[in-house]
Regions:
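S-adenosylmethionine
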Residues: 128-232
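Conserved beta-strand segments that form the floor/walls of ligand-binding pockets within enzyme
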Residues: 52, 69-71, 86, 193
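Conserved beta-strand segments of alpha/beta enzyme cores
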Residues: 23-25, 52, 122, 147-149, ...
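Short loop/helix-cap segments at secondary-structure boundaries that form the rim of catalytic
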Residues: 59-64, 158-161
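Conserved beta-strand elements of the Class I
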Residues: 68-69, 102
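N-terminal auxiliary segments of SAM/dcSAM-dependent transferases
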Residues: 1-62
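Conserved SAM/SAH cofactor-binding pocket of Class I
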Residues: 74, 78-159
Length: 233
């Protein structure tokens, strides 16, 4: 309860005050309709002239070929962030028809959903966060996509599966930690897109990629964020 939380905070303050001089103030935050605030601040995102990401309360975009409806809740992937935009734009230059796809760190599921709309027929999305997993399942249903299997887990969940295309919009540390697992899940013609890192991270990721038999297709950036598109050498 709020009362128990307040009492717990007071106990902590009292304990710390025994060790050093400490002053504190308490402010009650006015209750607000956070859903309304979120809706007021969530604007549709155009990835290019072929794709738009919107929320359920936006009007439909009948003039756009690929419309993706996302209810993000606590998950990452609305298209507003540079990394999501970078990966999605790059996806339009890849042939997805009848391909198998892995979306690592799937968040809202937006990348996997776009891959399905671009023609991929066998898709797996994996995220360690339970909120994200549940949200991705919900978003796939909203978009009438039934070809994606979402998994609550990490790279170990890949198992012995092999994919034509891997999307990993995560962060530098996880990419470096799990890249060997990703490469193991690639065939001789597979492609992989990494994002979620900065310019200074590129040498580390490229070095590890080349050690594992990958070669760079293209490197792109948006503001300070980077994207690497690689394939089997």
């Amino acid at each position: 309860t709020h009362l128990l939380d307040e009492n717990a905070v007071k106990e902590i303050i009292n304990e710390v005050a025994k060790l050093c001089e400490l002053s504190s103030t308490t402010t009650k935050v006015k209750q607000e309709n956070w859903n309304e605030k979120w809706e007021n601040n969530f604007e549709p995102v155009y990835i290019n002239d072929k794709c738009v990401i919107r929320a359920h309360f936006h009007a439909a975009f009948t003039d756009i070929k690929h419309e993706i409806i996302i209810t993000p809740k606590m998950s990452f992937g609305t298209g507003h962030h540079e990394t999501t935009s970078l990966v999605m734009n790059e996806m339009f230059g890849i042939e997805f028809t009848d391909k198998s796809v892995l979306d690592m760190g799937s968040g809202t599921g937006v990348l996997a959903i776009l891959a399905a709309k671009l023609g991929a027929t066998s898709l797996i999305g994996i995220d360690f966060d339970e909120w994200a997993y549940e949200n991705a399942v919900e978003n796939a249903e909203i978009n009438a996509i039934s070809t994606i299997s979402f998994i609550h887990g990490d790279a170990d969940a890949i198992g012995d599966a092999i994919f034509d295309i891997i999307l990993a919009n995560i962060n530098r540390n996880i990419i470096l930690q799990d890249i060997a697992t990703y490469v193991k899940a690639m065939n001789t013609k597979s492609e992989i897109i990494f994002s979620g890192f900065l310019k200074e991270d590129i040498p580390l990721i490229l070095e590890k990629s080349e050690q594992l038999g990958l070669e760079l297709v293209v490197s792109k950036h948006k503001n300070k964020w980077q994207m690497l598109h690689l394939k089997k050498a």
